[in-house]
């Protein structure tokens, strides 16, 4: 019996199979191929035969090192878990007193806080269809989006414009539509809450739905307060660069992740929040205006990075700027939740009436 040659791919598959035995559950792509051995010969892994391990050991070390790097590589989560959680909790905490009491309870604050990073938990390669569908909902590159003309209110109308221009919607981003659609879900749930409360029904199930929608909405609103989620300059300057801004691909996570977790705190954010108010007019238009205001700060992020503002403790200017951005997100989220509650009182026609 002739044993096939053994290479790095075989070594990697055996390493995966070893992990499989530890986990005691199957790994996709690992098969139970018969071991390569002669009759009566004790089984040894091929990598240990004929000096194979010594020859492959340098490659084994390199592979192990690369694998460790993949485990440690951070994902691009706007504001990281800490920032998203703080924004959500502060928004719920500062809601006006005329919202239902359950929205301001400590249990609600904990639930909404937990849900702040939730859409970033939907970005695992284990759910590839979900990742592909929802990744564009975290950002919009306003430069190419605006080149197509006024932004339509409906997602599918915008996608049609993008396709007609020979582009792909997932490359441009779908942030304002995602946020507005979740806000409308929240408003619909609040309308149902009003109806159930008026009929003296148990409102706990719809309260759970309201908290979920509020927390889910919070993620996108927080993304919308991060300037690098509104531009083609999202992770290193592209195009003409007369000011010498970084072209590296570290600025996005450096700004919104470790720096926020280490230096920005909830009391400072709350102190910079605006007074609560209802949002007048069309919500989509108001949200796009919010994104455009955020986009005016793109170059400030690069200026602060150039001055070392996101390294270690940063600078007083970078801490102040980041705190203000998080406060803008928390204020907008609070006002959107409050507006959903007020708008949910407006009577609507039953879409199923007469059917």
Task: Name what the model sees in each region.
Residues 7, 18, 29, 40, ...:
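Residue-identity detector for glycine
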Residues 27, 43-44:
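Short, positively charged and aromatic/hydrophobic N-terminal segments
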Residues 58-72:
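Bacterial N-terminal signal peptides
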Residues 72-216, 230-327, 332-355:
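N-terminal, motif-rich segments that launch catalysis or mediate targeting to/interaction with membranes
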Residues 216, 220, 224-226:
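Catalytic glutamate of the conserved HExxH
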